[in-house]
Amino acid sequence: MNASLKNWHTFLDTKNPKILDELLADEVIFYSPIVWSPQEGKQITKLYLIAALKVFGGENTNFTYVRQVIENNQFILEFTTIIDGITVNGVDMIEVNDEGKIISFKVMVRPLKAINKVHEKMGEMLEKLKLQKGKP
């Protein structure tokens, strides 16, 4: 397995956000399934990925990658999870640079009721994380 992909799986397994500091390039761009405009930079991408880990991989979600397609410096990871009883099917499309750092992370989600649930839960989690970050 590619070292970058292995590190991504380690982040998911350990839920250790410090792994993202080494895994994400400073110029990384995150493409949300909800927000049209790309989110640019390491800090905002890290915030989104931590929120997604809590929402998609939280208790009773049964988050699982069901397929991986690896070609050169690109990984396509299909996943399933359950959020509030709604089955979510999605794809993480990840591109890394020559140093193995993630430079692009795009998430696609289906069906519509799953998108609506992801929108709701990610909005709540992002607000919660922003409030926690703002505390002394």
Ranges and model annotations:
Residues 3, 44, 86:
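Soluble or luminal CAZymes and related metallo-dependent hydrolases
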Residues 1-26:
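Short acidic-aromatic low-complexity motifs
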Residues 53-136:
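A beta-strand edge to alpha-helix "cap/lid" segment located at domain peripheries
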Residues 18, 26-71:
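A solvent-exposed, acidic/Ser-Thr-rich amphipathic alpha-helical stretch
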Residues 10-11, 35-36, 93:
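Short N-terminal micro-motifs specific to bacterial/archaeal maturation
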Residues 7, 19, 44, 114-117, ...:
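Exposed alpha-helical structural elements
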